[in-house]
Every structure is written in structure tokens, then in C-alpha cells.
Amino acid sequence: MTTNLIDMQNSDVIMCTNNMAENHPVGFQWVMKAKERGAKVIHVDPRFTRTSAVSDIHVPLRSGTNIAFFGGLMSYAMQNNLYFKDYVVSFTNASFLIDPAFKTATDLGGLFEGLEQTGKGGTDPHVAQTYNKSSWKYQLDGEGNPKRDLTLKDPSSVFQLLRRHYSRYTPEMVERICGIPKAKFVEVAGLYCGNSGREKTGTITYALNLTQHTNGVQNIRALCMLQLLLGNIGRPGGGVVALRGHANVQGATDLEVLYHELPGYLPMPLRDAHPDLKTYLEKETPKGGFWVNRPKFFVSLLKAFYGDAATKENEFGYQWLPKRASADAYSHQHTFVDMYKGKVKAFFCDGQNPAVGGPNAKLARAAMQRLDWMVVVDIFLTETAEVWKTPGTNPKDVKTEMFFIPAAPAAEKDGSLTNTMRLIQWHEKSVNPPGQVQTDAQFICTLAHGLQKMYAGSKKDRDKGFLAANFTYGEKPDHPEVELVLKEINGFATEDINDKDGKLVYKKGQALSTFVHMTDDGKTAGGCWIYTGVINETPDGKLVNKANAHKPPDEKDYLAHGWAFAWPANRRIIYNRASADLAGKPWSEKKKLIWWDPEAPGQTPDKKGKWVGLDVPDFNAFLAPDAKNGDKPFIMRADLVGAFFGPLNDGPFPEHYEPIESPTRNLLSKQQNNPVAKIWSLPDQKNDLAPLGSKDYPYVITTYRLTEHHLSGVMSRYLPMLAEMFESHFAEISQELAKEIGIANGDKVTVSTPRGKIVAKAMVTHRLKPFQIDGKTVHQIGVPWHWGWKGVDSLPGSKGDITNDLSATVADPTVYIQETKAFMCNVKKGEV
């Protein structure tokens, strides 16, 4: 999320690639505000939804073809000279020269230079291939800097390679692949690209509609590249709007409820590659960009984990930190496959319902029935908590010993949430939890203290870190003061810290005001460096919780810096140096955000010059535009520029591939699927796939969410006022397909895939239309995924079959997210 939802009102054009009006209705107010001010709204979605109803143009496209669409837009912008050249030359790697040995997918039939066999995976090419990236690099000059061609004409320049790569993505090709009529695509391309540039800006929204694919990361890259090409990053009314699925997805990501990272997006060490702290920091710290500070953030994190026990002599406790055995072994899908195979013995499930909500849920339930024990912490007895009651399962055959811990919902606890726009907001409880129910913080601290008592006196090295870790926040060990938890996340001084003149800057224990003050020598501790500044502390020790600030936006501060705290540094639009030209002047007066004022008071009394404006500068506010790196906005990259050329696991440029299950051959190249996507081979028909052109599974299916329900239904199926809003589980089917297979609105239908089947009611609608794909009619249906076998007994419609029983265990090769937005199915009348 590069921007702020409030700023969407400044957009000249908004492209919603997801169903924002229904799934993010509060944030959608800013889309409507922009529309009131004259902005055009484009909705790109296979289904006509409430978002479509208030948009100027609805663009239905076949699920799984987003890269073809975005690639077509980039090609259109370049071919019609609609890209923002000054921005592109100044702030991106478009002018950088690439190794002449590199070949694009245009040259190699849909592949990139360097595809190799790994020697793993047997005959399955999807686990047996990887890319050798040795030619995916810049040409360097004698000083080790990338060579550049500012004219963008050199055939080895990123720009020319980009142009060549997307030269195949013509309006005609987009029509053949996506099913978007050529005339409509050209209209949309002209509208979006024509409303971007020096004087105008556009923004694009996305959510799981783009991520849940076997090229999910490349979908997002394609979107970002389009925004870079048009000069829409770091500027008012521009940006990339990543819409989160519920109130604290962003916070969970920041604090890293992820397998491969530590809080603050620090890489999780690998056992073999990072045997000691020195090696880890050397390998994971780049030579340029803001991540040169990674040692400060990482050592401060270790100090937050292990306190006084973390010293320079013991690598600040680095050896106590768990290490990954492999870079690709611990994702959600890896874990459940290993669980099914008996490699995982126990499972602690806190606030998740994988029996319903995850991919290939049938596999997940079977896996959870094979454990030694499982703990579920939730506010209701979910399908996961009672997985032994899965319909068709004999409880006597379930091996797993189950423990259920009732949890407290948001209204029963204090704490913070970090929402879509990186905004950390505080909430206070309305009532206490009933009976013996504990808040999350209480439960975790009580559990940790109990385990520490069990392990007290252990002489094993592996136990020392856990025994040293602090789980006491306040005077009552098992009743943590959550503001003190936030203070630890924010960061604090572990000893008195003086400046170079000997003046006291921080007293021991005082909260840090900025992550700039973090150190790599153990003098600071901090649980998540990007949150530093959310807590301030007065000299007398009083905490000032900025997450609890409530000043609404006004004319002087439309970005509402006085409302809560946005990481990093309360900055609302990141990369905002890009809102001004090389000289520090706004590209446009009506799009100004920050600018260089040469007469403003400088960093010291004897100097002048400072970046000023409407937001917190995303870099050193006193760094002049003509100073070294004063013209580089993308500070989190080592080369400080936005990346068109970015070597990921499946290519340096996004390339269209068909979903693993598809109704058509790849019309763009000979390479059908992502060559390095992950597909698991499993016994017992747990992950069978529909072959290309299968007559048994001829229809495309996509899954989605509803306004009236929440995720796997735990927060909605148990509440009558929400559960009654839909009569039953349903499948959306076009009028054309319904007529073809003899289905009427309200009929029961069976939707099946090679993995499983569900029964639902048919919702026959004109909101879905068949696609014409290369002259062939392709039908697509849509099925929400909120239902499970539990719900309100008096409302039978609150219960239903599990949509995710239909999906497969396949994954994107970079982050291993599932492909649940595009796969193949069959639809038959009745219960079959």
C-alpha cells in the first residue's frame, strides 16, 4: 500500500480490479468522493457487482488473465507515447543497461534466459525447474555502477527490453486471451493512460483477486510497473491501493505472522546459509538504500526478544533464534501437505479456520485428523475446532487429541489494529471477557510463563532463549498492559544514550521517537522498527500513544496526520520524493505533495533548505535535490529507483501464463503454465488436476467474498442478523450457461472438480456473461467461500458445503500463495 485511502479523492481516474464497494465499503467512500470531483472509475472484474454499478466502465475479463491485461496497457502506453518519460528516466531503472546475454520471453517462446532442471521432483516439471539468474543483471561501469542510456534507445536498456517483451500484448491479443472486446480495451487503455502523467494521476486497487494465482506476485508487479510507467507512484491521486481482507491483515503482516520473515520485514534466517549473526548481516544487508540499516533493526529486535540476556558476546542471542531449514518449507500449503504426510505432529491454531478457509480444505481437514494433538483458540467452536465432526468422518478414526481455548473478540480487549493504509489505530474494550475467557495477550503471556516454569533449570542451549524472553508487561505477570507491549514494539533505549556532545538523548527504558535512533550495538531494543514513533514518552515517563490520536482531516491536513499513526514515521504517501522533479519542484501545482524550500531553516542554525509540504518526507528532509541521492525516491531498493526489471523466481518481467487448470492453451506462447509454479503430488486423489481441454470440467470457476459474510464465516455464520441475509450457499451462473445445461434460478446444483464437490443453489444472473476466447465460448461461474457445516441451527441457510474443497494445492513460486481465483469445474443440476 503506497498511498492513503483518503488521497484517492485526488485521483483523475481509478481502476478497481477488485470488488471494493462490497468488500471494502468504508474505504470506497473515497472512490465516490473522487467521482464527485470528476474522476472516472473503471471496474475490471469477471462479475458485474456493486462496484461495477457505480463505475463509468465495467471491463469483464476471464479470471487468470490479469498479466495479459496489464501487459496490454503497458504496451499501449509505450506505443502511443502516453508514458511519463521524465518520471521514468529520472526515477526508475528504465535507462539501465542489462547483460547482453539476457533474452526476454518474446525471444524464447514464453520463457526467460536460464531455465534449468533442479534434479528434484522426478518427472513433474513444475518442481523440477528453476531459473539461473546469472544473466539477469545490470551492465556495470568501472566503479560498479549500472550503465545507463538516458535516451532509452539502447537495445539493452530496460526500457527497450520492456517494450520488446510487451510488444506481443496487442489489443487483439488481449481480446483473444482475456475476452475483452478490442474496442473496449482500447477505450479503457486510452482513458487510464490518458489520465496519468505530469498533470494527472490515477490509482489502482487490488486484493486477493490478483494475489491468489500461480503468478500472483507477478500480477502485483505488473500493476506496479504500469503505475511507474505512468508516473503514478508517490504522488497525490496515484499509488497502489492494496486492500486488506479484514481490519488487521496489515498488522499481522507487519509483525510477521509469516513463515519467511521476522517483524518489520526482516528475512528469517536460514539454518545453513546463516550459521551466525555476522554471516546473516553480511548476506542480508545490501550496499545501498535504506536497508543498509538492517543490522540496527535486527539487533534491536533480538534485544526486544531476549532483553539483558542478549549481549554482543553471545551474538545478541542469535543462536537462540529458530532458523528455517529451507526457504520453501513452511508456507501454509507446505505445512498442510507435511501434516497430511505425518511430518507435523502438533498444530496450534489461533484465530484461523483452515477447515473452511484455506485451499484444498478437504486435504487440510484430513491432515488435521492425523495429528497427535491440536489447540484451537477462537471465539466460536469452528469447523477446525471440531474437525472430528467433519460430515462423513467417523470420530473413532480421528487420531488427533483436541483442545479448545475460548478467545475474547475485539470488544472485550484493548489493543491496536493496523488497517489497509498502514494506519495503526487503538481501540478500547467495551466489556470484560466472560468467565475465565482471556484476551489474546493474557493467554499468550500465561502460557509462556507456564512453559518457562516447566523449563526452569534446563541446561540445554536451545532453551536459554525462551527462558530469557520477557513476557511480563506491567505489575501483574498474567495481565499484560498492552500499551507496554506496544512500547516494546515501538522500541526503547536499553541504557542511557548520549549524543556526540555528551547530551542525554534517551534515558534507559525511554521509548524511541524514531527508528533513525536504533543502533546495532545493543543500546536499543525494538520489536518492529517500522512502528517506531507510535509511542512517545515524556521525561517523567508518561506514554503518549499516537495510535489513539483522533484529530480528523481538515483543509490544512487532508491526509489526517493527527488521526492515529501510519508507519513509517506517520508518513501517509510513501516514496513521496517522486512527487517532485529532479530540482525538487512539484511536477504539477495541482498535484503537489512535498517540495524543496531553499529558504526554510536547515538541519543546523547555519544552514538553510528543507523539504516541506503536505506529508512527512520519505527520506532525509534536509537532503537537497542536488546532493548525492537527493533525487532518488525509492529508498528501500539498493539502487534507489523503481524497478521495471526485477528478477523474481519466475522472471524479471511479468509474463502471461494460463492458470494450472485452464479452458484454453496459452495463446501468447508455447509455455502453457508458469514453468516454476509449485504443484504437489499427493496420494488418495487429494490433488488431482483437470487436464487442458477436459470435457469433465469445462467451466472456469472463481471464488469470492460477500459484504454480508466474513472470510470463513466464523464472524458471520453464527450471528443471526448476518446469517439470515442469504437464504443459502449459492453459485452464480450466467443465464446463457443455465439455459445450456437446463438450470433455473434456485435449483440445487452440484459443482465439482477433481478434488471434490459441493451442493449449492443456483443464482442465475445476467451479472456474469460468457467469454469469447479465441473464437470459443468459455463459461465462468462464481462461488463465495464463507459456508461450512456449522452455523445457527434455526437458520439452515447459515450452513453449507465448503467451497474450498474444490480448489487445488498449487502455488506461486515466490510466496506460495494458492490459486483459488481461477480453476476448472463442472456444474450439474441436482445433487449428483
Regions found by a protein language model. Give the residues of each.
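Extended redox/cofactor-interaction regions of prokaryotic respiratory oxidoreductases
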Residues: 1-33, 37-39, 43, 68, ...
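Long, well-ordered, tryptophan-enriched scaffold segments
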Residues: 47-198, 286, 444
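Short beta-alpha connecting loops at secondary-structure transitions
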Residues: 53-61, 385-387, 406, 423-434, ...
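A glycine-rich phosphate-binding loop feature that marks nucleotide/adenosyl-phosphate handling sites
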Residues: 90-94, 191-192, 207-209, 239-250, ...
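Conserved short loop/turn motifs at secondary-structure junctions
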Residues: 173-180, 206-214, 243-247, 351-356
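Phosphate/diphosphate-binding loops
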Residues: 376-382, 387-388, 432-448, 750
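Long, C-terminal catalytic modules of enzymes
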Residues: 415, 422-523, 528, 535
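Long, contiguous, secondary-structure-rich segments that constitute the structural scaffold
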Residues: 442-495, 597-599, 604-606, 615-616, ...
